[in-house]
Design a protein with these regions (language model features):
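N-terminal regions of ATP-driven nucleic-acid and macromolecular assemblies
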Residues: 1-132
């Protein structure tokens, strides 16, 4: 219900490969196409540096074909992350009270920005706002 405000179900495509290498291939092809603004892969382990580099190159190619912003690739990995070669590393954890649902969003690593944390809270109209 919360995500309906942001994600139209008719505009999503799910691929469910069995192997991580196939998930990364799907992600690479989607990024390279330039027609998909965001690609998310949920992995059980950290990818090696070579596949991450391939994703970077695919996103650069996709940016040439995109009429809007360059495509964004998001790798969901266990724990606090640890994939080599990523541009940024984030951590999202629940941080709710009975009165207000929320999350703690932390930028753990970024090449051009220091670590930082935000408290993200849900507003009555199901939007989210950074509280800190």
């Amino acid at each position: 219900r919360i995500l309906r405000a942001f994600l139209d179900p008719a505009r999503r495509l799910f691929a469910t490969p069995q192997r991580a290498v196939d998930s990364l291939w799907c992600m690479e092809e989607a990024l390279r196409s330039g027609v998909v603004p965001v690609v998310v892969a949920d992995l059980n382990d950290y990818p090696a540096l070579t596949p991450v580099r391939r994703l970077h190159l695919a996103a650069e190619t996709g940016a040439k074909y995109s009429a809007k912003a360059p495509p964004l690739g998001v790798l969901l990995t266990p724990d606090k992350g640890g994939a080599a070669g990523v541009e940024t590393r984030w951590l999202l954890q629940p941080d709710s009270t009975e009165e207000q649902p929320g999350w703690q969003l932390k930028r753990l690593k970024a090449r051009r920005a220091p670590p930082r944390a935000w408290h993200i809270a849900q507003t009555p109209d199901y939007c989210f706002t950074a509280m800190t």
